[in-house]
A protein has these predicted regions:
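Acidic, metal-coordinating helix/loop segments flanking the phosphotransfer/catalytic sites
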Residues: 22, 35-53, 61
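Short amphipathic alpha-helix used as the core "switch/output" element in two-component signaling
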Residues: 67-79, 96-99
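Hydrophobic/aromatic residues positioned on beta-strands within the core alpha/beta folds
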Residues: 85-86, 110
Length: 131
């Protein structure tokens, strides 16, 4: 399976959610090379290690949000696949910020992920942005 070779980083401020999603993805054979709650450490890791896909929460606590991080990552790594994984049911709830997602980014509502295969498929789609 091609997705086993993908190098995936996760940025999620909730440690339980981060650990749960990471374990579920690893159980699907995916390679989570880095997970953090910190925007700063995510940027540093990405610049030094060039992951294939970034799975980002929108609300990362005080400071930059997931869209801010997505744009910083795309600026440094133009071909990185990006998934914004959020609790917001409607992108309009993010106001006009949703339009500032980098091209090719995927938007996925956490509550819609009733099976981990949904997120795996989105990761595979996001990875195609690299092509």
């Amino acid at each position: 399976m091609a997705n086993k070779k993908l190098r995936i980083m996760m940025v999620e401020d909730d440690s339980f959610t981060r650990a749960t999603v990471k374990k579920a993805l690893e159980n699907q054979g995916l390679n989570i090379v880095f997970d953090t709650e910190s925007v700063k450490s995510a940027i540093t890791f990405a610049r030094e290690n060039r992951p294939d896909v970034a799975v980002l929460d929108y609300n990362l606590g005080p400071g930059p949000n997931g869209i801010d991080l997505a744009n910083q990552l795309r600026k440094s790594l133009p071909d990185i696949g990006i998934i914004l994984l959020t609790a917001f049911l409607n992108p309009a709830e993010l106001d006009s910020k949703i339009s500032s997602l980098p091209p090719g980014s995927r938007y996925l509502v956490k509550h819609s992920v009733t099976k981990i295969e949904v997120l795996v498929k989105e990761i595979e789609i996001a990875a195609k942005y690299r092509s």
